[in-house]
Swiss-Prot record:
Keyword Magnesium: no
Any GO BP annotation: protein secretion by the type IV secretion system
Composition skew (Basic and acidic residues), residue ranges: 633-647
Gene Ontology CC: plasma membrane
Cellular localisation: Cell membrane
Pfam families noted in UniProt: TrbL
Protein source organism: Rickettsia typhi (strain ATCC VR-144 / Wilmington)
Record family assignment: Belongs to the TrbL/VirB6 family.
UniProt keyword list: Cell membrane, Membrane, Signal, Transmembrane, Transmembrane helix
Superkingdom to which the source organism belongs: Bacteria
Membrane topology summary: Multi-pass membrane protein
Protein's name in the database: Uncharacterized protein RT0031
Residues of the signal peptide: 1-24
Annotated TM spans: 226-246, 254-274, 409-429, 436-456, 469-489, 562-582
């Protein structure tokens, strides 16, 4: 009897364990789920947690590809009699987490963050999936195939309104610090998606409360239909004129009409269907196929030629052959981003990879020799500040603080002025390029309206104006880029003189990047060692620092090579001031040269930051002068009274004097001139 009871208990425990094991495969889906390139959604967001709370494969039969519904098991609270609850939903059904988790589970249905998330059944290619909204668009948490041999298509995971490169664009750059190239590519793909290819946003949200407006591409499609109808009427009127008037029946006019008509049709409404980059079927349009790439690619091509023709020997010169097809324009922006980091002492751009953490080195670039710099080991410097050992630190400002602690205010002011002017001018170029690119996309979008105007004499002036704006916006960034290339060339020569740079190429997966290490030239190496850039790199490595007490606290400052550093930095500052004043008129110069609109009104002013600093200094100076005037000694009051009495007797002279003082006070309180 006892043996039979023990056998029953063993069987019950075994069945329960098998049941629990059969439902323990949470996170399993009938078909593979898409994985984001960075793994962010699966690891750090609620999306990954919801995936690990759903089981599809157990119990068996949920992966049937011939049913139009999806069956899944949603996790219950720990300690429940059943590990999960089974639900079956059809395509288009939507349920909140709180509706699926009804057992007061604090991690799901009772969680204030997760309970209002809506799960919707929808198709992703050949899969029927249970999807949830994420920051990168709807993403599936459980899927099953609708046929026996599903096509290997992965659903898009990027935001429906934003280009994919906004998330993965940094992978196409060869510079460890990259933001300008990423901004350009992100904006380009986003504009392309908004204006031409359309987006993947549904017309209504999941609650069916908000109806989104039609995409720009839809509106342009209707616009092209109207233009096509107008062109048909134009052809009919030309045929009537040719039939009624023999002057229109000449071979010359007919040939000219055919050429102009084909030109207008091809560049305005397009010919023949074509798969565009977004995968949507559209007509082949001359403006999209030839005009837009030509207009947007003129600036980086022109500037890259100037960059390669000058500059320091090997500094921030990347291998163009390693850029992927369609992303070679990153070479210009990588050169700019790299110099920003190098001038400001970002150590990630310097070859500090002793332990191989950056990836596998695949070789060295041309320029520079392989002889290491003597006495340039940062690990042997004990007196250096702790901030110099932090990865990714901008060491330039740490060194400037060291000069401040040693009392060299002029070096600090000159260094800050150089960095502010340099960053202001580069920010102006980036914003100018982006504004011109947006203008080109807008002009391309409305091209179906302006291109047909070339057919009529009365409207041809509008077409000429449209062409002028397009060409000007394509050439203006090229002119400004030439100015930036000249600026950087002068900086390289003034900061590093004849120093050489050795490039280290690395690969980590599909990502390729490079670092640069300063090398002494084989001829006239003393000139390189006396340069401002070489001495700054020595300060970055910890040389030239001394520790002393300030009251009761130990501080670290720089007291070596102060005179030579000041002379070299003032030389760099002279170039900065020259380009600062020239940058005020570069926008107007580019507009006059290209006979187009001036973009300075909608771009970041190259002198904006400096002007704000000047206004702040003027305000502080005027405030201090007013404060000093308000503290007049008490014994001076009788003199003030006598002055007022004399002022009444003098009449007009007193009024003029008082008016002048009031004017000075008003200008002081308003932040007057220095």
């Amino acid at each position: 009897m006892k043996t039979l009871k023990a056998l029953k208990i063993f069987i019950i425990v075994y069945i329960s364990s098998v049941s629990l094991e059969s439902f323990a495969g949470f996170g399993e889906s009938c078909s593979n789920l898409p994985i984001t390139s960075d793994g962010y959604l699966e690891t750090y967001t609620a999306y990954g947690y919801i995936i690990r709370s759903i089981d599809m494969k157990d119990p068996r039969g949920n992966c049937n590809p011939y049913t139009s519904s999806i069956t899944f098991c949603f996790k219950n609270v720990e300690g429940s009699t059943s590990p999960c609850t089974i639900y079956t939903l059809n395509e288009g059904d939507a349920r909140k987490i709180s509706d699926l988790s009804t057992d007061n589970n604090p991690n799901l249905g009772a969680n204030t963050v997760l309970k209002n998330i809506v799960l919707t059944v929808k198709k992703f290619g050949n899969d029927l999936c249970l999807a949830m909204p994420t920051s990168r668009g709807p993403m599936p948490v459980a899927c099953k195939s609708l046929n026996a041999t599903p096509a290997p298509t992965n659903p898009k995971y990027e935001n429906c309104n934003i280009g994919k490169s906004c998330y993965t664009g940094a992978n196409y750059s060869q510079s460890l610090i990259n933001f300008s190239g990423l901004a350009v590519q992100c904006l380009s793909e986003t504009l392309n998606k908004i204006f031409f290819t359309g987006n993947s946003c549904s017309s209504q949200d999941q609650n069916s409360r908000i109806t989104h407006l039609a995409a720009f591409s839809t509106f342009q499609g209707y616009l092209k239909r109207i233009i096509g109808a107008a062109l048909i009427l134009y052809t009919m009127f030309f045929a009537f004129n040719m039939a009624l008037n023999k002057e229109y029946a000449t071979t010359e006019k007919i040939t000219l009409f055919i050429i102009k008509f084909l030109f207008v049709v091809y560049f305005s409404i397009g010919l023949e269907p074509l798969n565009f980059s977004g995968g949507q079927t559209v007509k082949e349009n001359g403006m999209l196929k030839y005009g837009l790439p030509l207009l947007t690619g003129a600036a980086p091509d022109f500037a890259e030629m100037i960059f390669n023709a000058a500059g320091s020997r090997g500094l921030c010169q990347f291998d163009n052959s390693k850029y992927k097809d369609g992303y070679k324009f990153y070479g210009l922006w990588d050169a700019i981003d790299c110099r920003i980091g190098y001038y400001l002492g970002l150590d990630l751009l310097y070859n500090i990879d002793k332990n191989g953490i950056l990836g596998h080195s695949v070789g060295n670039g041309p320029g520079g020799n392989n002889k290491p710099i003597p006495n340039f080991d940062p690990d042997s410097k004990k007196d250096r500040p702790h901030d110099l050992s932090k990865a990714g630190a901008l060491r330039f400002f740490t060194v400037m603080f060291g000069f401040l602690m040693s009392g060299h205010i002029i070096i600090l002011v000159a260094g800050i002025a150089f960095s502010v002017i340099f960053l202001s001018i580069l920010l102006y170029f980036i914003t100018h390029y982006l504004v011109c690119m947006i203008t080109i996309y807008v002009m391309t979008y409305i091209s179906p309206i302006f291109i047909p105007m070339v057919l009529f004499t009365r409207t041809k002036a509008y077409f000429d104006g449209w062409v002028k704006v397009c060409i000007s916006c394509a050439l203006q960034p090229a002119v400004v880029a030439g100015f930036i290339a000249l600026l950087i060339t002068m900086y390289d020569s003034a900061i590093f003189k004849n120093c050489e740079f050795l490039r280290y190429d690395y690969e980590k997966g599909d990502i390729r990047f490079s670092t640069f290490e300063l090398r002494l030239p084989s001829i006239d190496a003393d000139k390189c060692q006396e340069s401002f850039g070489y001495k700054m790199l020595k300060y970055y490595a910890g040389e030239g620092w001394e520790e002393h007490l300030l009251i009761l606290f130990p501080i670290k400052s720089i007291v070596r090579d102060v005179v030579s550093i000041l002379a070299e930095l003032l030389c760099v500052l002279v170039f900065s001031v020259i380009f600062y004043y020239f940058s005020k008129s570069i926008g107007r110069f580019a507009a006059d040269l290209t006979n187009g609109p001036n973009m300075d009104a909608v771009t970041a002013s190259p002198t904006k930051i400096v002007d704000l600093v000047k206004k702040g200094a003027a305000f502080l100076q005027d405030a201090s002068s007013v404060h000093a005037q308000g503290k007049s000694p008490v014994e001076d009051k009788p003199d003030i009274g006598s002055k007022r009495k004399d002022g009444v007797q003098q009449g007009e002279d007193s009024e003029n004097s008082s008016g002048g003082e009031l004017a000075d006070l008003a200008s002081g309180s308003g932040g007057g001139k220095l």
